[in-house]
Amino acid sequence: MSPSVILLLSVCVYLAIGVPVAFALGLSTVTALLVSGSFPMLVLLKETFTGIDSFPLMAVPFFILAAELMSGGSLTEVLLKFAGQFVGHKRGGLGYTNVVALTFFSGISGSALADAAGPGSMMIKMMDKAGYDRPYAAALTASTAIVGPIIPPSIIMIIYALADDNVSVGALFVAGLIPGLLIAAAMCVVNWYISKKRNYKGDGQMPTGPEMLKTTWQALPAILLPVLILGGMRAGWFTPTEASVVAVFYALICGKYIYRTLEWKAVPDILSRSALLTASVLLIIGMSASFAWILTIEGVPQSMANWITSIHLNAWTFLIVINVFLLLFGIFIEPLPGVMVLVPILAPVAAKIGVDPIHFAMVVIFNLTLGMITPPVGGLLFVTSNVSKVPLTELTRELKPFLIAHGIVLVLLTFVPALSNWLPHAMGFK
């Protein structure tokens, strides 16, 4: 039996018995090496280290730290107030506020789980007190939180660029803007429909002009973080890795000296949380790298490319097949290891049959992220269920219209490549 077959069978077994993803990838690599005897065990250590020995990867801990610092500076309350002033007075206003606030927060956190656990949990409580059904509030939060990995800066996009040499971090950051806003717009449409159907009321009166200017001025430093990152990269002031360091200093200044809510005594806890999250990310990346190395050495990507060529799939048919596969795969595997394992295999195949690399990247990232809210085992569902105290069955029932909306967005992203690649190409990214 070939090492690649042993590898794939063993990882399925380990995942089925509940082994965490990072350890399942590592253990399956060990199993393949031991049973096949084709490679020395040193491969595991070498490829694991090689997988995390990357300069662009240094951006990950700094973006994580920047998000923690901004959250520690009570950014959530500022963004909720800013978002609410524009849409809070409308029918279903708190639902719109939820979507807008989470979209803005995505430009800081880059994480769906952070969005759901942070501002999302606050919005669920606010919506519950205002008379919204709590399961609906939780479903709206989970469905909107997946904007986190789409809106820049996104950790998943950094990892994707590491796995595919044909795209840059900057190009992916810019490529995520239109799809991210499209997802947010789709969630607003669903909220409009449900709010009208259930007669959810607005939240008070629209604020006056001076009040709106004051709130906007307060939120401006936080809103400018993604602009600073993308603008600085486009102007050539700094690379994505350097941008992450700039983001940390900017977040520190905002939290300590602008919003004045970040205390020095809280910094050690913030550093500790950031270090733990970074360690978990790097562990997954390292284990995924050794896993993917065996598949590559065994010629799995080339074999798949040859097979697809032999059955004469065109680019559109290929994308349809990939969508189905990734949706199923994303239900059981989180986006981060999914990108590390699948992209080295699928990206060369997509390029060979003429799919634009940036377009393909957005299709892959959105599919895997969508798996986080797809029953029965979407990871984001469990987080949202936990913070909202809503049973998973009730949360799942409320998800149906949101999943339909996400499906429509996925179809648009798949068959309208310009939604993904027009802006990066227009800004000079390749």
Region locations from a protein language model:
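Alpha-helical transmembrane segments of multi-pass membrane transport proteins
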Residues: 1-430
